[in-house]
Structures are given as C-alpha cells and as structure tokens.
Amino acid sequence: MDIEQKQAEIIDQLVKRASTCKSEALGPLIIEATSHPSLFAFSEILALPNVAQLEGTTDSVYLDLLRLFAHGTWGDYKCNATRLPHLSPDQILKLKQLTVLTLAESNKVLPYDTLMVELDVSNVRELEDFLINECMYAGIVRGKLDQLKRCFEVPFAAGRDLRPGQLGNMLHTLSNWLNTSENLLISIQDKIKWADNMSEMDKKHRKEAEEGVEEVKKSLSMKGDVDIRGNKEMFGEPSGVMDYEEDGIRPKRRRHPVTR
C-alpha cells in the first residue's frame, strides 16, 4: 500500500472521530494525529467546524499545534515552544520529517549544512541516518545522498498541506505558465508556417531551375542540328563540282603507233 492510500484511510478514520468529538476530547485526538507515523497531511482535520471552534478557548493551543503540523517546521516550533504543548519524541520526529518536505518544495538539492541547522542535527552521520531511515524508507521522499558534495538530491517529495494564501500564488503561477505556453505555441505555429513557405519557395525555385536546364538542353540540341546541316552543305556539294572540273580538264592520253 503506497503512502497516499495509507494516509487516506487514516485521515478518513480520524475525520470521522473528530467530527463527533466535543472540544475537550479534541486535544488528545490532535495529539494522536500529529504523532501518527504514517500521517503527513492535516488539512481535512483542520477544516472541521468543531476543530475551528477551538479558537479563543482554553484548548486553542491544540488548534495552534495542528496548524503547526499542517504548515510549520521544526524551526517554527522552537520559536513558539513556550505557547505550544510539549512535543513527544514521535511528534518531534514527525515535525522534522515535515521540515524536510518543506525544504524540498523549493529546492531539489539540499546542502547538508542547511539540513543540520534546520533539523538540529550535530553531525553528518546522524543526518544521513535520519534521511535514509526516517524519510526515504518512510516513502515521503526519494533522493540520493552525495557525500562528496555534502548534499541531499531530492527528485521527489510528498506534498504538504497548502498554507493560507498559497493556493492563490499557485493559481497565479499556473496562469503565468498558461500564458507562456500559449505564446510559445503561437511562436511554434509561426515557425511552422515560415518553414512551410520556405519549402514552397524552395520547390518553386527548384522547378524553375529544372525548367531552365531543360531550355538550355533544347537550345544546345537545336544548335547542334544546325551545325551538322551546315557542315554537310560546306563539304558535300563543292566536292562534287571539283571532281567534275578535274574530269573536264584531265588531258587525254595519245596512243602511239606500234612499230613492227
């Protein structure tokens, strides 16, 4: 079972339970959700009306905790630890996993130095063990550890819950991408038309060149015929006259009498 399917089943169960809980029972359920080893999305629980009603009550810290796991990082928790519930080891692990997902949203190459600061890890061995055992084996990221360059290359990372305002930014980005794609398509179509026109012109020029060659061939053929006839006239008829004249002026041989 992949991570998305597993999460869907867990979320469905928790949403059903949370939707019928009273406010005093929501705190333990939120702690359970944020500690679950296979749950990395919390927006559906956060969207429940009775969960939203925790705002302004004595249990509002659990609502803040749920928001932290939906959108925040380990660094955010450290900055607000005094007004949030104390985290269990499972929750700390979960929040650090979510921190890696947040970092991978904007960068596909994560330097070890950045990760060690963001995760409060003191050495490379500990960091690499965490990335392998708690992130890659958990299925939330796919990547490669580059010990020479001291970085974590992340071609895939599971998505987190959308932060407030993030959907609008995504729509704006998609709109810009769509406009760019349309302009690119128009440019490609123009280039295709230009190529077609050039092809037609090339065919036309080639045809004209072939016709020109044929005309030259015909002209040369006609000139050759004329030259041959001229040569026959120059060297054929005068030769006959000369023979005639030679025959006309040739002296006749006298026959001498024979003496006996």
From Swiss-Prot:
<comment type="similarity">
    <text>Belongs to the CSN7/EIF3M family. CSN7 subfamily.</text>
</comment>
<keyword id="KW-0217">Developmental protein</keyword>
<dbReference type="GO" id="GO:0000338">
    <property type="term" value="P:protein deneddylation"/>
</dbReference>
<comment type="subunit">
    <text>Component of the CSN complex, probably composed of CSN1, CSN2, CSN3, CSN4, CSN5 (CSN5A or CSN5B), CSN6 (CSN6A or CSN6B), CSN7 and CSN8. In the CSN complex, it probably interacts directly with CSN4. Interacts (via PCI domain) with CSN1 (via PCI domain) and CSN8 (via PCI domain), and (via C-terminal tail) with CSN6A, TSO2 and RNR2A. Cannot interact simultaneously with CSN1 and CSN8 to form ternary complexes. Also exists as a monomeric form. Binds to the translation initiation factors TIF3E1 and TIF3H1.</text>
</comment>
<feature type="region of interest" description="Disordered">
    <location>
        <begin position="228"/>
        <end position="260"/>
    </location>
</feature>
<dbReference type="InterPro" id="IPR000717">
    <property type="entry name" value="PCI_dom"/>
</dbReference>
<keyword id="KW-0736">Signalosome</keyword>
<keyword id="KW-0607">Phytochrome signaling pathway</keyword>
<dbReference type="GO" id="GO:0005737">
    <property type="term" value="C:cytoplasm"/>
</dbReference>
<keyword id="KW-0963">Cytoplasm</keyword>
<feature type="compositionally biased region" description="Basic residues">
    <location>
        <begin position="251"/>
        <end position="260"/>
    </location>
</feature>
<comment type="function">
    <text>Component of the COP9 signalosome complex (CSN), a complex involved in various cellular and developmental processes such as photomorphogenesis and auxin and jasmonate responses. The CSN complex is an essential regulator of the ubiquitin (Ubl) conjugation pathway by mediating the deneddylation of the cullin subunits of SCF-type E3 ligase complexes, leading to decrease the Ubl ligase activity of SCF. It is involved in repression of photomorphogenesis in darkness by regulating the activity of COP1-containing Ubl ligase complexes.</text>
</comment>
<dbReference type="InterPro" id="IPR045237">
    <property type="entry name" value="COPS7/eIF3m"/>
</dbReference>
<dbReference type="Pfam" id="PF01399">
    <property type="entry name" value="PCI"/>
</dbReference>
<keyword id="KW-0597">Phosphoprotein</keyword>
<dbReference type="GO" id="GO:0010387">
    <property type="term" value="P:COP9 signalosome assembly"/>
</dbReference>
<dbReference type="GO" id="GO:0009585">
    <property type="term" value="P:red, far-red light phototransduction"/>
</dbReference>
<dbReference type="GO" id="GO:0008180">
    <property type="term" value="C:COP9 signalosome"/>
</dbReference>
<protein>
    <recommendedName>
        <fullName>COP9 signalosome complex subunit 7</fullName>
    </recommendedName>
</protein>
<keyword id="KW-0539">Nucleus</keyword>
<feature type="domain" description="PCI">
    <location>
        <begin position="1"/>
        <end position="159"/>
    </location>
</feature>
